[in-house]
Amino acid sequence: MALIFRTAMQSVGLLLSLLGWILSIITTYLPHWKNLNLDLNEMENWTMGLWQTCVIQEEVGMQCKDFDSFLALPAELRVSRILMFLSNGLGFLGLLVSGFGLDCLRIGESQRDLKRRLLILGGILSWASGITALVPVSWVAHKTVQEFWDENVPDFVPRWEFGEALFLGWFAGLSLLLGGCLLNCAACSSHAPLALGHYAVAQMQTQCPYLEDGTADPQV
């Protein structure tokens, strides 16, 4: 029963990490980190991502333009690019390492401790990937709120608001964190049954000489 529960925990943790990694990649390239709705022209909406700005018009559709210079971007967008790339890389490494630590993958009975360490390392990498995804998303959201409520900006000036990519990034980061927690919990729970099994084998070995001689065990 414990083995089935541990295997299920490993599978769910790996799937959550995979889901968070995929959503993190989508968040990185989705041009909807910020949305701007013009009151004067409701048929035209602006969106901004880490790589480009887009205008959506009912007659023309979506037209996007890449940013000309990386150094000309605001600080939060420059750092967000780096952190999102780092999150994607850490997430991929976490999935790769965790996959080799699963119980369903047989790499030898003598390497149980190695698999446990791989599972723990994969969980830590998923944690790091989730944190590095949450930081840029939360930073951009914080700057958006600050600019929205800035009293120095006149009321008639349009304000940027939260885009869909921010919510997707939050969900991706939480999925990676939860997946890493499950992987580490599964790795920690896999150590106790193993030690208990070694104790049972050792106890049987101490009783075997008495059974072969036909004498009673003095511990009974």
Curated annotation (Swiss-Prot):
Membrane-traversing stretches: 11-31, 82-102, 118-138, 162-182
One Pfam family here: PMP22_Claudin
GO biological process: bicellular tight junction assembly; cell adhesion
A Gene Ontology term for the protein's cellular component: plasma membrane
Membrane topology (Cytoplasmic): 1-10, 103-117, 183-220
Principal localisation: other
Stretches in topological domain Extracellular: 32-81, 139-161
InterPro entries assigned: Claudin, Claudin_CS, PMP22/EMP/MP20/Claudin
Cellular compartment(s): Cell junction, Tight junction; Cell membrane
Recorded topology in the membrane: Multi-pass membrane protein
Keyword Ion transport listed: no
Keywords, comma-separated and alphabetical: Cell junction, Cell membrane, Membrane, Tight junction, Transmembrane, Transmembrane helix
GO molecular function terms attached to this record: structural molecule activity
Reported function: Plays a major role in tight junction-specific obliteration of the intercellular space, through calcium-independent cell-adhesion activity.
Similarity-based family: Belongs to the claudin family.
Record-given protein name: Claudin-24
Organism: Homo sapiens
Lineage, uppermost ranks: Eukaryota, Metazoa, Chordata, Craniata, Vertebrata
